[in-house]
């Protein structure tokens, strides 16, 4: 049976083969088309897979963005709460500051008012001080004028002081000269004391000669020559020598011309000393002469004694030749003794 079936099928083989070939070709074509479609589908699938991958990535990024946005939103919410809290604290601080500033403004206003009163008071004080300054300026001007006057006076006083210094030097020099004069006068006084004994004896002889002259005049008889010394010049020689020594010493020790103030003071002292001298006049000498007793120091006493002795010794022996002695000059000072001696000589 089996062989019969195959025998029947053999003539059908080429047709089957052709049909199969055609079928195969069609199948191949279909397969090719299917492969093409498959390749296109695969391509599309790859594209879609890539797109899906991108979409997945985008979704993940979106998810991440959402999470980050959520975190950001939470952070923003937290920041908003914090800012609200900070704003509340800032408002409270601002309110406190406003209160403090208002209090400070009130204090500043009070201080401004106080300063205004102080400024007004100080402006008054400044006005008073300006008035005082004006008065002080006037006083300074007057004081400057007085200072100028005092400066001129001080210049004059300085000039006077210079003159006084020069006068002091002159006075010192004159004091040295006076000490030298005192020494010389002491020497002359010693010499006069030595010659006093001789003068007393000579005075006795002179008295005797005067008595003899008077008796000879009244009796018209010549005086006895035996009582008189043989040479009258020998009697008068020692006092003349002493009197000549005194003016020589005075001329040698005569000081230089002094300043006018010192000369005036010496004249005043001399007038005071001579005013103190009491004048002794006898009853018999009222019309003729009057002796003056000098109450001076040791220098003036020695000079006065020498002058009186020279005057008595130089008198003429005759009573008719007696000279009338006038009063001494009260203004004569120590410097005027040489003039007196010249008159006596």
From Swiss-Prot:
Basic and acidic residues biased stretches: 261-277
Region named Leucine-zipper: 164-192
Segment forming the signal sequence: 1-19
Coiled coil residues, start to end: 16-211
Localization of this protein: Secreted
Record carries keyword Signal: yes
A GO cellular-component term linked to this record: extracellular region
Region Disordered: start-end pairs: 223-345
Tissue specificity note: Expression found only in the brain and spinal cord.
Protein name as annotated: Leucine zipper protein 2
Source species of the chain: Mus musculus (Mouse)
Taxonomic classification: Eukaryota, Metazoa, Chordata, Craniata, Vertebrata
């Amino acid at each position: 049976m089996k062989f019969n079936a195959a025998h029947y099928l053999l003539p059908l083989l080429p047709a089957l083969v052709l049909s199969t070939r055609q079928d195969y070709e069609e199948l191949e074509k279909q397969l090719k088309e299917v492969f093409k479609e498959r390749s296109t589908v695969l391509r599309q699938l790859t594209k879609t897979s890539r797109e899906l991958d991108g979409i997945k990535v985008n979704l993940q990024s979106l998810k991440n963005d959402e999470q980050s946005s959520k975190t950001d939103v939470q952070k923003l919410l937290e920041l908003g709460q914090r800012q609200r809290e900070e704003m509340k604290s800032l408002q409270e601080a601002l309110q406190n500051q406003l209160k403090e500033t208002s209090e400070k403004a009130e204090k500043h206003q009070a201080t401004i008012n106080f300063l205004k009163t102080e400024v007004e008071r100080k402006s008054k004080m400044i006005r008073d001080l300006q008035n005082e300054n004006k008065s002080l300026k006037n006083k300074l001007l007057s004081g400057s004028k007085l200072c100028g006057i005092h400066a001129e006076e001080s210049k004059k006083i300085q000039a006077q002081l210079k003159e006084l210094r020069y006068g002091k030097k002159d006075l010192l020099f004159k004091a040295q000269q006076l000490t030298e004069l005192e020494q010389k006068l002491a020497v002359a006084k010693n010499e006069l004391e030595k010659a006093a004994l001789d003068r007393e004896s000579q005075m006795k002889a002179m008295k005797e000669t005067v008595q003899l002259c008077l008796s000879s005049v009244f009796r018209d008889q010549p005086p006895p020559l035996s009582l008189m010394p043989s040479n009258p010049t020998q009697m008068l020689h020692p006092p003349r020598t002493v009197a000549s020594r005194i003016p020589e010493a005075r001329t040698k020790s005569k000081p230089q011309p002094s300043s006018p103030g010192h000369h005036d003071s010496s004249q005043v002292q001399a007038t005071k000393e001579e005013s103190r001298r009491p004048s002794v006049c006898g009853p018999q000498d009222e019309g003729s002469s009057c002796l003056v007793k000098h109450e001076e120091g040791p220098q003036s006493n020695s000079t006065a004694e020498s002058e009186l002795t020279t005057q008595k010794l130089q008198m003429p022996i005759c009573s008719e030749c007696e000279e009338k002695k006038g009063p001494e000059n009260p203004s004569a000072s120590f410097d005027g003794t040489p003039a007196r001696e010249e008159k006596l000589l």
